[in-house]
Amino acid sequence: MLEKKDIERAKKLFKEWDNNHVWDEPNPAFLENTRKKAKDSLGLAIYLLDKLEHTKELENNDTATIWIIVTSYYSMFFEVEYLLGLDGKKLPKGAQDTHKTVYLAFIYYYIIKGSELEQKKPGQMTTSRMSKALAMFKKLQDESLELQRIKKSAEYLKTQREDRHAFTYRMSRAAEISETKKSITKATEFRQLIEEYILSRQL
């Protein structure tokens, strides 16, 4: 569930950024680079998990599972940077807390903007720019299911960002591997969701 404080912070911050033209303009090289980094990060996470499960190469490496979670998260982070870039938005040089800022930008521009959340209406969100785009691919699903996927994608980005900080050495190896699989699944689903949305805008 989106936290009220994040919704309010996102609305305040990005209305101000839009009014003051704070965003930098991304160039084609930036777009290509962020898209490649998103794909490569997820590929690296999958590669490391495969090595961890099927070879002895990393069995004594205590940081392998941590890096799988980190690279899974970065896949999502770069995917959102790419999505924002397609909309002419690149974080300005010197932006504070880039990871939190990118998360807030994602929920503002693709979930809050154009929905009831922007007008401060109570109750559940029923429309968003992303839900309308995703509906092109999911015609058989009703709007509430669409919104569950959209809100889930924002939650994935947030929880992965938190997991990157919270992952500790207390877990057993089996528990660590289980967590890495969850991270890869989240990153894969998130990437698919964003890529579908991007593709829908080209139709």
List the predicted regions and their residue ranges:
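Terminal alpha-helical segments
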Residues: M1-L203
